[in-house]
Curated annotation (Swiss-Prot):
Belongs to the UPF0127 family. NCBIfam families: PRK03760.1. It comes from the Archaea. This is UPF0127 protein TK1120. The lineage of its organism: Archaea, Methanobacteriati, Methanobacteriota, Thermococci, Thermococcales. It holds the Pfam family DUF192.
Amino acid sequence: MIINETKGKAWHGKVKLADTFLKRFRGLMLVKNVNHALVFVLPAETRANASIHMFFMLSDIDVIWLDSSRRVVDFKTAKKWRLYTPKKAAQYIIEGPVGLIRTLEVEEGDLISWTPTEEREKAVPVKSLIPGKINLNGSKNSIAMVESVKEVKANEV
């Protein structure tokens, strides 16, 4: 979700972060149907680093540039195969589907916040022992425990 805190407007779509070099490099290039927003977290607040290109884009997108305090410094609907640089230095860039700017009623100086959509990992069952050394593995009254693949590496018991 992306919120224009100044206007009290919200966009209830999926939000992903581009907070690494590779994620920022990939961006939304070659995405056929842009149905989510991508928030670029830049390493420094500058105009040059906040410049974007629309090469290899398959559709137009809305772009919002924010300074380090999350205030809008520039915004526009970006067309395919063009270059864009914000009017002022920016630390964050929000790219999303056309209509995002209209929905949020964005104007320069607005305060914008976002909540990244949690990406759920595939779950794997994990064998476990209950405290007190009671093993419920194989028991009819067992407790099924599941943890994220990223968080737990299941060991064979």
